[in-house]
């Protein structure tokens, strides 16, 4: 199933998110399982499967990273999030210092200035990666996109770790 076709969108990475949402709601109205409650079991099963497919497609296309991986898949590239970073050692070595900064933050009881600085660095890297991915998709440089996705995954992960560690710290002091 091609999710771009399902939602009547052009098959390109950058999508009209408003149109995606509009078409999602139209499909949900047409294929919502509650509308077929009096139909046969086989029809209900088909409708339920279609509804699941619609929801999965919507979640895939709505999320930047999932859409990127899906679009690569449509273009013949199999991408597994779990192993991407392992293939980008140079990048890991270069940016592992962000984890050291996170450790320093924890040791300094999440100094507000240092925390804001690290958050800004990470957010700028995430924005840069997303713009670079969009650009490389336009140029159909899929192998470069894969490399940048691994970098984006790293920055997203450290952002999540920072948030989690900061929340743990806040619970401890309260």
Swiss-Prot record:
<dbReference type="GO" id="GO:0006457">
    <property type="term" value="P:protein folding"/>
</dbReference>
<comment type="function">
    <text>Co-chaperone involved in the maturation of iron-sulfur cluster-containing proteins. Seems to help targeting proteins to be folded toward HscA.</text>
</comment>
<dbReference type="InterPro" id="IPR036869">
    <property type="entry name" value="J_dom_sf"/>
</dbReference>
<dbReference type="GO" id="GO:0051087">
    <property type="term" value="F:protein-folding chaperone binding"/>
</dbReference>
<dbReference type="InterPro" id="IPR001623">
    <property type="entry name" value="DnaJ_domain"/>
</dbReference>
<comment type="similarity">
    <text>Belongs to the HscB family.</text>
</comment>
<dbReference type="InterPro" id="IPR004640">
    <property type="entry name" value="HscB"/>
</dbReference>
<dbReference type="GO" id="GO:0044571">
    <property type="term" value="P:[2Fe-2S] cluster assembly"/>
</dbReference>
<dbReference type="InterPro" id="IPR009073">
    <property type="entry name" value="HscB_oligo_C"/>
</dbReference>
<dbReference type="InterPro" id="IPR036386">
    <property type="entry name" value="HscB_C_sf"/>
</dbReference>
<dbReference type="GO" id="GO:0051259">
    <property type="term" value="P:protein complex oligomerization"/>
</dbReference>
<keyword id="KW-0143">Chaperone</keyword>
<comment type="subunit">
    <text>Interacts with HscA and stimulates its ATPase activity. Interacts with IscU.</text>
</comment>
<dbReference type="GO" id="GO:0001671">
    <property type="term" value="F:ATPase activator activity"/>
</dbReference>
<protein>
    <recommendedName>
        <fullName>Co-chaperone protein HscB</fullName>
    </recommendedName>
</protein>
<dbReference type="Pfam" id="PF07743">
    <property type="entry name" value="HSCB_C"/>
</dbReference>
<feature type="domain" description="J">
    <location>
        <begin position="2"/>
        <end position="74"/>
    </location>
</feature>
């Amino acid at each position: 199933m091609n999710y771009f076709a399902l939602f009547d969108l052009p098959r390109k990475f950058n999508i009209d998110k408003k149109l995606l949402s509009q078409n999602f709601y139209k499909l949900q109205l047409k294929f919502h399982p509650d509308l077929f409650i009096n139909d046969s079991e086989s029809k209900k099963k088909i409708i339920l499967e279609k509804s699941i497919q619609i929801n999965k497609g919507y979640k895939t296309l709505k999320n930047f990273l999932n859409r990127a991986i899906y679009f690569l898949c449509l273009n013949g590239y199999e991408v597994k999030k779990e192993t991407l970073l392992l293939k980008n050692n140079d990048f890991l070595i270069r940016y592992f210092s962000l984890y050291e900064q996170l450790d320093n933050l924890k040791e300094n009881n999440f100094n507000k200035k240092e925390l804001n600085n690290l958050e800004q660095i990470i957010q700028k890297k995430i924005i840069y990666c997303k713009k670079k991915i969009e650009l490389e998709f336009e140029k159909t440089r899929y192998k470069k996109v894969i490399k940048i996705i691994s970098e984006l995954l790293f920055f997203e992960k450290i952002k999540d770790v920072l948030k989690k560690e900061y929340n743990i710290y806040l619970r401890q002091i309260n």
